[in-house]
Regions:
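Terminal amphipathic alpha-helical/low-complexity segments used for targeting or macromolecular assembly
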Residues: 1-59
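Short, intrinsically disordered/low-complexity patches at protein termini
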Residues: 32, 37-39, 85, 99-100, ...
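Left-handed beta-helix
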Residues: 58, 63-64, 69-72, 77-78, ...
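Conserved small/polar residues in nucleotide/adenosyl-binding loops
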Residues: 117-124
Length: 129
């Protein structure tokens, strides 16, 4: 089982795994690009969101700035939107339903820190629906 599979199933995993590091880096680069686009650059924003949120069919309206750990673990329903400073710590899957309006400065967080000292080198996560 890969570290990503462990992470998504809620098991202890190594967050320094190369695949996970590359996915996080990619998501942060895309979010940074999105945040730097002007609101009238809708085609560019759409292209970035398609890459950042590949599993979302109907893209939401996201008011920049936005932040994601992975992006590919976040799923938006139809006609959803999020105001500025929207943060998704999508270590586990995040499912946002249809017609959801998210206010400013909202964080959706799935990571669960491990409380035992000998396990703190690892993290776990739970899905958020």
């Amino acid at each position: 089982m890969t570290e990503r599979e462990k992470m998504l199933s809620g098991e202890l995993y190594d967050s320094s795994d190369n695949e996970l590091e590359q996915l996080r880096l990619h998501a942060r680069k895309l979010a940074r690009r999105y945040n730097l686009t002007d609101e009238d650059q809708q085609e560019v924003q759409t292209q970035i969101l398609r890459e950042l949120l590949p599993a979302t069919e109907e893209l939401p309206y996201l008011q920049a700035p936005v932040y994601f750990d992975y992006g590919c673990h976040t799923y938006f329903g139809k006609y959803s939107s999020a105001n500025f400073n929207f943060t998704c710590l999508d270590v586990g899957e995040i499912h946002i339903g249809d017609n959801v309006m998210i206010g400013p400065n909202v964080t959706l967080a799935t990571p669960m820190p491990v409380s035992y000292t000998h396990l703190r080198a690892h993290e776990t996560a739970a899905n958020l629906v």
